[in-house]
Amino acid sequence: MSGGVYGGDEVGALVFDIGSYTVRAGYAGEDCPKVDFPTAIGMVVERDDGSTLMEIDGDKGKQGGPTYYIDTNALRVPRENMEAISPLKNGMVEDWDSFQAILDHTYKMHVKSEASLHPVLMSEAPWNTRAKREKLTELMFEHYNIPAFFLCKTAVLTAFANGRSTGLILDSGATHTTAIPVHDGYVLQQGIVKSPLAGDFITMQCRELFQEMNIELVPPYMIASKEAVREGSPANWKRKEKLPQVTRSWHNYMCNCVIQDFQASVLQVSDSTYDEQVAAQMPTVHYEFPNGYNCDFGAERLKIPEGLFDPSNVKGLSGNTMLGVSHVVTTSVGMCDIDIRPGLYGSVIVAGGNTLIQSFTDRLNRELSQKTPPSMRLKLIANNTTVERRFSSWIGGSILASLGTFQQMWISKQEYEEGGKQCVERKCP
């Protein structure tokens, strides 16, 4: 292969998009990621006598270190002393050992090819710090020995996935909702607006609703058998007998999985500001919990997601200075230069798994059209397929890494060896 050309069609670059909720990875040039598994991983620390539990599907960390259980199947098996942890905090890598375990697992189980053969394009949070970027670059070159590397901001990749190089990316994921202005493929740092009202917040609201309605949350791992019961009558189920002593963090994770299913099946955003009378007229949705308890949900379906758009009616948020989704967008545009605002309003791109709640985009479109200055043309871009919206930054990375014109952008191993880890600041905006 000729000296300096990496990537290209024949080498197959890998694209990693590691979010707070799931990890997405696969080959550049394909239309969707090969793998999509939870970022949360199970961790069992060795006992004092050095014995661990059965080693079947665990990935052993360093000698004497913890054992990691990664991927849906391994994570959801109840095990004694297994904590559910996440390597990320605020979208940035916090725990490097478990982060490395995720990469090891992906290479071993899914890529099934030598790390040293594939250039890697990785997505990163727009607010990622210099120290973390350099550490990541060092890890990829030194530990995985990859031939070339590139780091790109998630918002820029989302814009590319939608065929734009300028636009305002509204990304609502698990941990936060952010508006990120992108101009000519660069993130405008001063215009980033973040709000903690996102998927995890909705999960929390659902939890409170279940407590109020006295609905017991029983994750499937505890259930040995259940009987069909009438709507609204108490559940009739048998508990599994030999359950190990699970940790609270893992049990919580399993409960959240149940709630997330409920979120996707039941919730809907109201077309206009939430109104008791209108909500009462809404058709109800029937939902059955894993333990067999089932009932209809009416007004609650609209009330819970309302907090995303109108945080003032959420009880328990003290002082409440948080911004609703449409405010996040308008505030962000307002912080950018006046000349580029038309370009931002002209392509507001919606991305992230949390935006898949029914009618989310309709409500956003309606609120933004009321707030957009009359001189601006508003255009909301939202893919209607779940795949494209959940994986938008991965798809953008897949497009970018397979472009012929991108091939001179890679940080090659040679450049890394000559310039050290500082070259990531110079080559990856």
From Swiss-Prot:
BP-aspect Gene Ontology terms: blastocyst formation; chromatin remodeling; DNA recombination; DNA repair; negative regulation of cell differentiation; nervous system development; neural retina development; positive regulation of cell differentiation
Effect of E227Q: Found in a patient with developmental delay, speech difficulties, attention deficit hyperactivity disorder, behavioral problems and dysmorphic features; uncertain significance
PANTHER family from the UniProt entry: ACTIN
The protein, known as: Actin-like protein 6A
Pfam families membership: Actin
Organism: Homo sapiens
Subunit structure: Component of numerous complexes with chromatin remodeling and histone acetyltransferase activity. Component of the NuA4 histone acetyltransferase complex which contains the catalytic subunit KAT5/TIP60 and the subunits EP400, TRRAP/PAF400, BRD8/SMAP, EPC1, DMAP1/DNMAP1, RUVBL1/TIP49, RUVBL2, ING3, actin, ACTL6A/BAF53A, MORF4L1/MRG15, MORF4L2/MRGX, MRGBP, YEATS4/GAS41, VPS72/YL1 and MEAF6. The NuA4 complex interacts with MYC and the adenovirus E1A protein.
Modified residues (Phosphoserine): S86, S233
